[in-house]
Amino acid sequence: MSDIVVDDFSEKQAARLNKLSKRLHREVGKAIADYQMIEEGDRIMCCLSGGKDSYAMLDILLNLQKRAPISFEIVAVNLDQKQPGFPEHILPAYLDNLGVAYHILEKDTYSIVKEKIPEGKTTCSLCSRLRRGTLYGFAQRIGATKIALGHHRDDIIETLFLNMFFAGKMKAMPPKLLSDDGANMVIRPLAYCREKDIAEYAKFKEFPIIPCNLCGSQENLKRGAVKDMLKQWDKHHPGRIESIFTAMQNTSPSQGVDREQFDFAGLTRDPDAPMRGDVAESDLPAFDFLDTSNSGHIDLDAAKARSDLLSQQRIDIVSSYKP
């Protein structure tokens, strides 16, 4: 757990920060364990942008490093993309005070973006691709075995809907990803963390936040619309966002329509198979078993009991015809 200084906080604020810190550390620890993100001897390149998410990620990883049963190294890396007005002194001062190893890189991707993207258009996509390429190359240069990025649960869900709505794909951000060339392993330790928790934590910790819109680019309108949609769902339908994320971890290719993920053409029936009932497992109305007291998760025990009951019911033949 992070070391919390409570001198400047009221007792209520200190209690809230302690609870929030425990939750975030627990969620990061669980994500790391679930996806085996960090292993003995790893050198983790922690990408620090100056935003709330990457600050929180670095802070939590450093705290977990002190108590972890394995040994791993953390190196913070920031890429100065030469955006006008970028406060170059903030991150070095913060990292010096923290006592963590770090590198500040400089590469003028801003000029490239301004040259390629028409005035008034969102530059975020090209900017992030250029940044990613530079960071991937530097990770190999310093011998980093993992690249840690600060994407959280909201980012993952937003990306899922963006791809569904605008690209026709069921695709999100995996908590752990091997780069296309196989040279870099990307991890997202905040994958289980809610953005609103991270924002509150960052405010308590008083991280020296650097705004991401120094370039003058506006937020991607599509992502903004999806973010607003999810906020409304979270407000009016508690548990829905949690249920969506749970569903992303419980996919059933055989119950979908993607022929690349499941061999539908190869399906064959077994005429000698014992009868299990007149309701297929996939036809169970899962929504009948929503456990509203458990963040909207499905009550699997209730669903199975209902399935077993249906299987035991006798089928009465009330009419038949044979020509």
Curated annotation (Swiss-Prot):
It catalyses: cytidine(32) in tRNA + S-sulfanyl-L-cysteinyl-[cysteine desulfurase] + AH2 + ATP = 2-thiocytidine(32) in tRNA + L-cysteinyl-[cysteine desulfurase] + A + AMP + diphosphate + H(+). GO terms for cellular component: cytoplasm. Its EC number is 2.8.1.-. One of its GO terms (molecular function) is sulfurtransferase activity. It comes from the Bacteria. The keyword Cell wall biogenesis/degradation does not apply. Its cofactor is Mg(2+); [4Fe-4S] cluster. GO terms for biological process: tRNA thio-modification. Its main location: cytoplasm. A motif (PP-loop motif) lies at residues 49-54. Pathway: tRNA modification. InterPro entries: Rossmann-like_a/b/a_fold (IPR014729), TilS/TtcA_N (IPR011063), tRNA_Cyd_32_2_STrfase (IPR012089). Homodimer. Catalyzes the ATP-dependent 2-thiolation of cytidine in position 32 of tRNA, to form 2-thiocytidine (s(2)C32). The sulfur atoms are provided by the cysteine/cysteine desulfurase (IscS) system. NCBIfam families: PRK10696.1. PANTHER family: AMINOTRAN_5 DOMAIN-CONTAINING PROTEIN, SULFURTRANSFERASE-RELATED. This is tRNA-cytidine(32) 2-sulfurtransferase. It comes from Shewanella denitrificans (strain OS217 / ATCC BAA-1090 / DSM 15013). The lineage of its organism: Bacteria, Pseudomonadati, Pseudomonadota, Gammaproteobacteria, Alteromonadales. The gene is ttcA.
